[in-house]
Amino acid sequence: HGAHKNPYRGRNPAWLSGGIERDGFIHWSQPEIVLYDLDPENCSFDAETGLPGEGGGMSYPDLIEQDGSYWITETQKTVARVHPIDSTLLGDLWSQGNVRTVTQKGLILDLARPHLADGEVDLPRLPDLAEGGGLSIDFWIQLEVMSAGQIILDSRNASGEGIVVKTARNGRVRIEMNDGKNSGRWASDREILQPGSWHHVAIIVDGGPNVITFVVDGLLGDGGTTSIYGWGRFSPELSDVTGSEKLRVAPSLLGRLGRLRIYDRYLRTSEAVANFHAGR
C-alpha cells in the first residue's frame, strides 16, 4: 500500500495487517494505518492529483507483545521511538470477515430507499479536517452504464465549496473536496465498478495523516497494477468541506443507490469491511 522503487521512500504512513492461521495457511486482513509522520518532508504529494511523493518515514519496525499489550518500535537514524498500539485495532484486524454489523459510532446520516429518491437532504456540519477531524461516506451502488462524470453525491455551494462524489474513467469512483481556499481529491482503483452489479463503496477521509482511502466490496484499494499507491494525500490546511449543508443525492446517476451512510469521523478499514458484510 506504499511500496516505492526506492526502499528508503514511501514509508509514511505505516500499515499493519493481522494474520490468522487456517488449515496451515496465514490469511491476512485488510490493512490499517498504524503510524504516521507529520514532518512536511515525509508528507509530500502532488496537489493536483493527490498522489503521494517520495517522503521517507519510519524504519526498522518491531512488534512487542507483553501481558496482552502491544507496542511498535521504530527508528530514524539516531532517534528511536516506542508506540503503544490500541488493542482494539488489532482485535478488529483479526476479526475481519466475522463482524457483520453496521458501525453506528459517528453516524450522522443514514438513508435507505425510498428516501434516497428524495433528491436533496440536509447535511449536518462535518468536522474540520485541518483540526484532525475526519469523515466517511459509505454507500451501495448499482450502475446501469459505466461512464465518467455521473454525480453520485454533491454538497457543493455556488462557490464550489463542499464535496462531490462521482464516477471517473476506467471504472473508478472519485471524491473531490473544497473549503473555498484548499482542495483535495482521490480516486479508487481502476475497474472496481461493473455495470449491473451491486457494489459497496466506503470513502474514508482521515485528517490525522491527511489521507484518503477507498474500501470497495471489503477490499482496501492498493493501486492494483497501475499505481504504486491505493491511497492519496490532501493538504493539512484543508478544513471545512461541508459546503451548502444540503446533499444532492444521485442528481445525474445512471443507476441507483441502495443505502447511504455518512460518518463524522474516519472509519477504520475493519469497520468499512464490517459494513460491507452487513449488506444493504
Segments predicted by a language model, with ranges:
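Extracellular glycan-associated modules
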Residues: 102-280
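Beta-rich catalytic cores
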Residues: 12, 57-59, 135, 197
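Loop/turn-rich, solvent-exposed surfaces of beta-rich toroidal or solenoidal domains
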Residues: 1-39
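Short loop/turn segments immediately following the C-termini of beta-strands
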Residues: 1-4, 75-77, 206
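Conserved blade-ending motifs and adjacent loop-strand segments that build the rim/top face
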Residues: 23-66
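Blade-level signature of beta-propeller repeat domains, shared across WD40, Kelch, NHL, RCC1
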Residues: 57-107
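Hydrophobic/aromatic beta-strand positions that recur at structurally equivalent sites within the blades
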Residues: 17-21, 83-85, 215, 263
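Beta-propeller fold detector
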Residues: 26-36, 93-101, 225
